[in-house]
């Protein structure tokens, strides 16, 4: 590898350290042995116009040279790029990665190879690395200067203003005009100078990374973005230009697009001499197959364009790289060319799963000056804060979010110990990245076209392959807004913008465990094996003791939840005049008596357990090995508080009504939800007293089942069970109604584009991630099923971190059917509404069956009710368009997916770990039945967590609720240190090969993330397995309903 001429490479200017780089080979594959022999020097021109010389063996395949360039740049997402050069016929072609370099570049001393962008994704948020987006921005800058990216003056000025912001920083008119005089970005730049300066003034505070992102946001909407024109003629001899994009083949007349052939419509591509042929699929109502013919300058031009089409189709439409064709025994017909490298789907999965060593870097622009504070503003487009200071050091925790109070963390080469020093609480702000969706936009949707060289008679057919199972990754997803696998986000919501996700603590570097925090790491905590074994032997062995202990541990958590409203929320409200007095008098006077009562209840339970364990009054211990009398006494006391319990539903409705009518109160409540103590949505805490009654009922059922009828505690337990069952039955209807009401309001906060989600009569049924088939292929969408309508949304990179509603399908008159064979997509469903039809695909067969069952049930209910009521119809977005107009509008909205807000449209942070986001990142779904079952399956207590790199165990206080594990140092902590959403995880018992050698250990596993936890007894082990299994393995609807019916509220 040679030396750079004068200027450093993009990676070195960004401060990226040298490393071995990332190969484009899939995991488990080994690169072909590099041929020995004579070396050849190849000059590569980078996107910043610097040149680099590389020495490679002459007989080496093109992949060796391409990988050397990617390694030199430390480029992870190198598959979007390619090397182009003029061949001996002066035709600009792409370097074939499989052929020997010497057969392609015959005179390397006289050929300049260019490293450029080859595949332009439809959505720049799919580019997950800042370096990748920077290189794309350089490509846009280059295309502007060369006249490839044509646009109007306003768009050109806006693009240049973002480039100037990235290069020189915040607005300074004199500096701007001096810079524009020295740098020409477009041929007629002088006429645009005033507009450029005006636009640049609006970008104050925008970081270079944000400028790159906004540049791509503007560029991707231009018709000529990523378009490379190839001159041709149609059958009539009219001069046209052909181009290929992620969607298919495009036809231009000049710079105006006049036709487009989507991949789904193309059956076969071929060429014969200088004729390029496109064979289309027949229409639904016709068996006639249309074949289009275009004439190009010659066979070489024709074949070159055909190869480009083959590669674009494979990259954007296939799940995995097509397998090579077997060599013919006798005769060889047709082209042997095939796409080589990872598909976009594989690239997205590879980066998301953390299958690489994240390179931490900072931009080094000598003239950068920005007035924006990283603390005060959300950094919407950044996948990571470019510059990390000691005050914003970060800790990765699984796939990693961060500790807001991190003050210092040494690099692992120095020490593994990370420390936290107390500091002022930072203003919560989101640090998000424009990451791509789980399913690639453009993965295999319909049966793809065959590509063949008819002149030589061969076929290079490309068929969609089944996606490979996810490979285990060893790194953490740093710099991503994705849900942390075990996140140190003690707020349970948005993470501070001034905290970066450091890759230097990832397991790849053997530096720290994915389960690490200053309070949860190997060095900071003593080993607890001997101590815990001793304590466990002193505990009683009776199952009734552990049932009673469960009452104590869960009561502690319940008391903390009451304090969120009675103490923390009330204290915050008293400091600000943002809540009406009537609302205050409805909420707080009904929580304070409950808090006082349950404080005394907990003391009684703990005193009884102390006697049971023999820690005091050992001579009378036998008389106190029971809990039924305590439960009966206090449940009878609760009946006197029933009036307060009835008020909680009224308080919830009043709060949501007030929030709807007061922007100030809405912002106040949203800010409170971002505080550390509010680890769940605020309205969830208002329903906690109703949920707690069910837990008492379950505990008493277990006690009655455990004790024989002649046991001293049986009579009290049975009497207490009768009392609590009566209370639960009285509140049953209210609880069902309020859970639906609370869920609708929670979903409303996650959605934008619909204002009337919560109306009387609307019921939530299921939410989850599905892939929607469109002209761009399969694109990940979040679907929300209600009893009257099915909404689908996309997750754009917005400062609010919400999902944008893009379409709605009324259920009345809808039909649903499986359509895997028709579209060639696994787990595919076709939904046909009265005005619109869509095709969706689930991530698995079980997910498809859940959606099929729930949607069909909702359709049947809509049919029985003879269509939606007028009120339900009025709640839906207006839809008076004709079917054609509706389709066009839907297509338009598809082009607008994932669009980010500009820096002038920043919104307040939004909780980023809601169930909607978990389902999005785990590609799963959850129903209202699941939510109701989750309410019943809540548990608290001490667990031992195994250290990743040693045999030690660490004691943690763990709370399981809302499909998530929350971790505390002890039960006295006011807020969790970390959280682990469990949807998508598998729950198993460790095998002998894992060398755990301890009793009562269970294992949680998701992709490369593995955690071992240890319970104190057989009963607690079974209880943890039971409640966690309810979240990790969602049962079928029929099973869920039967379970639900067997547990009456």
UniProtKB/Swiss-Prot annotation:
<dbReference type="GO" id="GO:0007167">
    <property type="term" value="P:enzyme-linked receptor protein signaling pathway"/>
</dbReference>
<feature type="modified residue" description="Phosphoserine">
    <location>
        <position position="903"/>
    </location>
</feature>
<dbReference type="InterPro" id="IPR019748">
    <property type="entry name" value="FERM_central"/>
</dbReference>
<dbReference type="GO" id="GO:0098890">
    <property type="term" value="C:extrinsic component of postsynaptic membrane"/>
</dbReference>
<dbReference type="InterPro" id="IPR000798">
    <property type="entry name" value="Ez/rad/moesin-like"/>
</dbReference>
<dbReference type="GO" id="GO:0048813">
    <property type="term" value="P:dendrite morphogenesis"/>
</dbReference>
<dbReference type="InterPro" id="IPR011993">
    <property type="entry name" value="PH-like_dom_sf"/>
</dbReference>
<dbReference type="InterPro" id="IPR041788">
    <property type="entry name" value="FARP1/FARP2/FRMD7_FERM_C"/>
</dbReference>
<feature type="domain" description="FERM">
    <location>
        <begin position="40"/>
        <end position="320"/>
    </location>
</feature>
<feature type="modified residue" description="Phosphoserine">
    <location>
        <position position="876"/>
    </location>
</feature>
<feature type="modified residue" description="Phosphoserine">
    <location>
        <position position="837"/>
    </location>
</feature>
<keyword id="KW-0217">Developmental protein</keyword>
<feature type="modified residue" description="Phosphoserine">
    <location>
        <position position="373"/>
    </location>
</feature>
<dbReference type="GO" id="GO:0005085">
    <property type="term" value="F:guanyl-nucleotide exchange factor activity"/>
</dbReference>
<feature type="modified residue" description="Phosphoserine">
    <location>
        <position position="900"/>
    </location>
</feature>
<dbReference type="GO" id="GO:0016601">
    <property type="term" value="P:Rac protein signal transduction"/>
</dbReference>
<keyword id="KW-0344">Guanine-nucleotide releasing factor</keyword>
<dbReference type="InterPro" id="IPR029071">
    <property type="entry name" value="Ubiquitin-like_domsf"/>
</dbReference>
<feature type="domain" description="PH 1">
    <location>
        <begin position="763"/>
        <end position="860"/>
    </location>
</feature>
<dbReference type="GO" id="GO:1905606">
    <property type="term" value="P:regulation of presynapse assembly"/>
</dbReference>
<dbReference type="Pfam" id="PF09380">
    <property type="entry name" value="FERM_C"/>
</dbReference>
<feature type="modified residue" description="Phosphoserine">
    <location>
        <position position="403"/>
    </location>
</feature>
<feature type="modified residue" description="Phosphothreonine">
    <location>
        <position position="24"/>
    </location>
</feature>
<feature type="modified residue" description="Phosphoserine">
    <location>
        <position position="340"/>
    </location>
</feature>
<feature type="modified residue" description="Phosphoserine">
    <location>
        <position position="882"/>
    </location>
</feature>
<dbReference type="GO" id="GO:0098942">
    <property type="term" value="P:retrograde trans-synaptic signaling by trans-synaptic protein complex"/>
</dbReference>
<dbReference type="GO" id="GO:0030425">
    <property type="term" value="C:dendrite"/>
</dbReference>
<protein>
    <recommendedName>
        <fullName>FERM, ARHGEF and pleckstrin domain-containing protein 1</fullName>
    </recommendedName>
</protein>
<feature type="region of interest" description="Disordered">
    <location>
        <begin position="866"/>
        <end position="908"/>
    </location>
</feature>
<dbReference type="InterPro" id="IPR035899">
    <property type="entry name" value="DBL_dom_sf"/>
</dbReference>
<feature type="domain" description="PH 2">
    <location>
        <begin position="936"/>
        <end position="1033"/>
    </location>
</feature>
<dbReference type="GO" id="GO:0098978">
    <property type="term" value="C:glutamatergic synapse"/>
</dbReference>
<dbReference type="InterPro" id="IPR018979">
    <property type="entry name" value="FERM_N"/>
</dbReference>
<dbReference type="InterPro" id="IPR014352">
    <property type="entry name" value="FERM/acyl-CoA-bd_prot_sf"/>
</dbReference>
<keyword id="KW-0770">Synapse</keyword>
<feature type="modified residue" description="Phosphoserine">
    <location>
        <position position="893"/>
    </location>
</feature>
<feature type="compositionally biased region" description="Polar residues">
    <location>
        <begin position="402"/>
        <end position="412"/>
    </location>
</feature>
<feature type="compositionally biased region" description="Low complexity">
    <location>
        <begin position="435"/>
        <end position="448"/>
    </location>
</feature>
<dbReference type="InterPro" id="IPR000219">
    <property type="entry name" value="DH_dom"/>
</dbReference>
<feature type="modified residue" description="Phosphoserine">
    <location>
        <position position="389"/>
    </location>
</feature>
<dbReference type="GO" id="GO:0098974">
    <property type="term" value="P:postsynaptic actin cytoskeleton organization"/>
</dbReference>
<dbReference type="GO" id="GO:0007416">
    <property type="term" value="P:synapse assembly"/>
</dbReference>
């Amino acid at each position: 590898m040679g030396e750079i001429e004068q200027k450093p490479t993009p990676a070195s200017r960004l401060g990226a350290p040298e490393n071995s780089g990332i190969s484009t080979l899939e995991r488990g594959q080994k690169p072909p042995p590099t041929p020995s022999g004579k070396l050849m020097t190849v000059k590569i021109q980078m996107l910043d116009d610097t040149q680099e010389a590389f020495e490679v063996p002459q007989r080496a395949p093109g992949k060796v040279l391409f990988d050397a360039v990617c390694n030199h740049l430390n480029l992870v997402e190198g598959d979007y790029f390619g090397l182009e050069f003029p061949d001996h016929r002066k035709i600009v072609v792409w370097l074939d990665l499989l052929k020997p370099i010497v057969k392609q570049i015959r005179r390397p001393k006289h050929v300049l190879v260019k490293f450029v962008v080859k595949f332009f994704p439809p959505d720049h948020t799919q580019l997950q690395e800042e370096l990748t987006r920077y290189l794309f921005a350089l490509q846009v800058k280059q295309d502007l200067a060369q006249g490839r990216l044509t646009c109007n003056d306003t768009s050109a000025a806006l693009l240049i203003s973002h480039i100037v912001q990235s290069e020189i920083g915040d607005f300074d008119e004199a500096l701007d005009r001096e810079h524009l005089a020295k740098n020409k970005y477009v041929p007629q730049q002088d006429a645009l100078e005033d507009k450029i300066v005006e636009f640049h003034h609006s970008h104050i505070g925008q970081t270079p990374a944000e400028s790159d992102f906004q540049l791509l946001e503007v560029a991707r909407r231009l018709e000529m973005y990523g378009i490379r024109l190839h001159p041709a003629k149609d059958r009539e001899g009219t001069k046209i230009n052909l181009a290929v994009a992620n969607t298919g083949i495009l036809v231009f007349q000049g710079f105006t697009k006049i036709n487009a052939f989507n991949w789904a419509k193309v059956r076969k591509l071929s060429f014969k001499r200088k004729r390029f042929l496109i064979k289309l699929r027949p229409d639904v109502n016709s068996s006639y197959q249309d074949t289009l013919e275009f004439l190009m300058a010659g066979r070489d031009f024709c074949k070159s364009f055909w190869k480009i089409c083959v590669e674009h189709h494979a990259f954007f439409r296939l799940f995995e790289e097509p397998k090579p064709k077997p060599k013919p025994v006798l005769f060889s017909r047709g082209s042997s060319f095939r796409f080589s490298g990872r598909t976009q789907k594989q690239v997205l999965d590879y980066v998301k799963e953390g299958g690489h060593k994240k390179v931490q870097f900072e931009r080094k622009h000598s003239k950068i000056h920005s007035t924006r504070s990283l603390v005060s503003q959300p950094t919407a487009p950044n996948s990571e804060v470019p510059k990390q200071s000691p005050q914003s050091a970060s800790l990765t925790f699984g796939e990693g979010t961060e500790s807001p109070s991190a003050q210092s963390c040494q690099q692992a080469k120095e020490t593994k110990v990370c420390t936290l020093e107390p500091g002022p609480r930072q203003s919560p702000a989101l640090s998000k990245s424009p990451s791509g969706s789980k399913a690639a936009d453009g993965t295999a949707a319909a049966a793809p076209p065959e590509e063949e060289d008819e002149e030589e008679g061969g076929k290079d057919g490309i068929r969609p392959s089944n996606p490979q199972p996810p490979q285990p990754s060893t790194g953490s997803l740093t710099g991503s807004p994705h849900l942390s696998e075990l996140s140190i986000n003690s707020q349970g919501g948005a993470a501070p913008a001034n905290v970066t996700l450091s890759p230097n603590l990832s397991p790849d570097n053997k530096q720290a465990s994915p389960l690490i925090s200053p309070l949860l790491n190997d060095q900071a905590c003593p080993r607890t094996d001997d101590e815990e074994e001793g304590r466990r032997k002193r505990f009683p062995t009776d199952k009734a003791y552990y049932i009673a202990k469960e009452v104590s541990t869960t009561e502690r958590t319940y008391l903390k939840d009451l304090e969120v409203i009675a103490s923390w929320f009330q204290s915050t409200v008293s400091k600000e005049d943002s809540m009406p007095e009537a609302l205050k008098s409805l909420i707080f006077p009904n929580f304070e008596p409950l808090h006082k009562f349950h404080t005394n209840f907990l003391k009684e339970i703990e005193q009884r357990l102390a006697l049971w364990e023999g820690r005091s009054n050992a001579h009378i211990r036998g008389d106190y090995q029971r809990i039924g009398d305590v439960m009966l006494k206090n449940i009878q006391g609760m009946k006197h508080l029933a009036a307060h319990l009835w008020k909680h539903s009224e308080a919830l409705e009043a709060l949501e009504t007030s929030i709807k009518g007061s922007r100030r109160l809405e912002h106040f409540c949203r800010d409170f939800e971002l505080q550390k103590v509010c680890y769940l949505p605020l309205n969830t805490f208002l329903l906690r007293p109703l949920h707690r009654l069910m837990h008492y009922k379950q505990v008493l059922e277990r006690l009655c089942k455990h004790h024989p009828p002649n046991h001293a505690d049986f009579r009290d337990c049975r009497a207490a069970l009768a009392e609590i069952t009566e209370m639960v039955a009285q509140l049953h209807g209210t609880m069902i109604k309020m859970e639906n009401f609370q869920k609708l309001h929670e979903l409303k906060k996650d959605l934008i584009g619909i204002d009337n989600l919560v109306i009387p009569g609307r019921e939530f049924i299921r939410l989850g991630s599905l892939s929607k088939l469109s002209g761009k292929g399969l694109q990940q969408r979040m679907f929300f099923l209600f009893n009257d309508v099915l909404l689908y949304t996309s997750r754009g990179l917005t400062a609010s971190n919400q999902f944008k509603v893009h379409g709605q399908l009324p259920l009345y008159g809808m039909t649903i059917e499986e359509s895997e064979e028709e579209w060639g997509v696994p787990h595919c469903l076709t939904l046909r509404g009265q005005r619109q039809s869509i095709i969706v695909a689930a991530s698995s067969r079980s997910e498809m069956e859940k959606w099929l069952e729930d949607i069909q049930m909702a359709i049947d209910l809509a049919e029985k009710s003879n269509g939606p009521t007028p009120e339900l119809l009025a709640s839906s977005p207006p839809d008076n368009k004709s079917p054609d107009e509706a389709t066009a509008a839907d297509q338009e909205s598809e082009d607008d997916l994932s669009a980010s807000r500009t820096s002038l449209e920043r919104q307040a942070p939004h909780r980023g770990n809601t169930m909607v986001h978990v389902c999005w990142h785990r590609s799963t779904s959850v129903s209202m039945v699941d939510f109701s079952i989750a309410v019943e399956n809540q548990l608290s207590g001490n667990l031992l967590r195994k250290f990743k790199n040693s045999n030690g165990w660490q004691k943690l206080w763990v709370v399981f609720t809302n499909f998530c594990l929350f971790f505390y140092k002890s039960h006295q902590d006011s807020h969790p240190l970390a959280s682990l959403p469990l949807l998508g995880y598998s729950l198993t018992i460790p095998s002998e090969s894992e060398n755990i050698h301890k009793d009562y250990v269970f294992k949680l596993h998701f992709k490369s993330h593995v955690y071992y936890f240890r319970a104190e007894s057989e009963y607690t082990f079974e209880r943890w397995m039971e409640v966690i299994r309810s979240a990790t393995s969602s049962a079928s609807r029929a099973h869920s309903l039967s379970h639900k019916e067997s547990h009456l509220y």
